[in-house]
Amino acid sequence: HVDIVPTLLDILEIETATKYDGRSLMQQVNSHDDELEQEFYITECTWMRKHGWRTPEWKLIIALEPDFHFKPEIELYNLKDDPNELKNLVDLRLDMVSVLKEKMDKWIAKRKKETGMDSPIFEQGDWHGIQGHGSFKSSQEAYDSLYIGDANTAKRLQEKSR
C-alpha cells in the first residue's frame, strides 16, 4: 500500500518534493519478468498475523500468533512442485526454512534501519479489533473470538441471492 501514491504520481507524471516510504511500481509494470524482484517479504493480517518470505520456488510462512484454522506455526511450500500449497515441507527441509528466515530477518532489519520503525505487524496487539485483548494464545481462542458468521445466516444469505 505504501507504493500506491508514488505509482499514481508516476502514472500522472506529477513531480513532487515529498518523500514517500514507498516507490513507484511503474518500472516493474514496464519491465520484463527477468528484471522484476524475484524474492519478497509477505504479510497477512486479515484474520491472523503471519509473515514470510517468497521466492519463485519457495514460500515460507511464520505465524506470529496461533492460527484459527489450526495450521502449524511454520509452513514451507515448494511452489514449483506444489503450487496449491498442500504439502508442508518444514520437517523435511529445515535447511530451506533457515535460509529463507535469514533472508526475511535481514530484510526486516534493513527496513527498520531505513524507516526507524518496526513493522505494524509486530506492534499492533489489538489489530483484530478486540480492544485490550492482545495476541491470541491458542488456535481455539482465535477461532472462538473472531466472528466468522454462522451456518444459518450463511444459508439465508445464499437463498436470498438465488
Predicted feature locations:
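Low-complexity, glycine/alanine/valine/leucine- and proline-rich hydrophobic stretches
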Residues: 51-75
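Non-transmembrane alpha-helical segments in soluble domains
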Residues: 5-9, 13, 26, 77, ...
